[in-house]
């Protein structure tokens, strides 16, 4: 028996979850299901143009796993476009992680609007040189609380 799939990190939840070809009535329409993490893989690789290693790191998975997710997503989208099927985005094994940006000029931090995929700029100074704030580890540091400072005699 295989192990359960690892939970994937997702920074964007799509607001439009159903795409239908024009001219085909709903009762006569077949669907292709696309998981939320598959949409995230398409967004990171094809829309943001990141390298696979960076995409995999942001999703918290290995490169081969990212490649499998991306290949499956592209195959499903191509199948829907070629055969005239609807695309339904739902489900998957993921956790939503809000991404924070930091301006390199004024060091302001904010959470970008997930529906706005255009080029971001700092709301405080208008700067365009931004970086993603590094994730902070929620675990205590190694050895924290184990050592005591010896008392002076």
Curated annotation (Swiss-Prot):
Residues 139-153 have a biased composition (Basic residues). Residues 129-138 have a biased composition (Basic and acidic residues). Residues 129-153 are annotated as: Disordered. It comes from the Bacteria. SUPFAM superfamilies: Sigma3 and sigma4 domains of RNA polymerase sigma factors (SSF88659). InterPro entries: RNA_pol_sigma_r3/r4-like, UPF0251, WH-like_DNA-bd_sf. Belongs to the UPF0251 family. This is UPF0251 protein Daud_0090. The lineage of its organism: Bacteria, Bacillati, Bacillota, Clostridia, Thermoanaerobacterales.
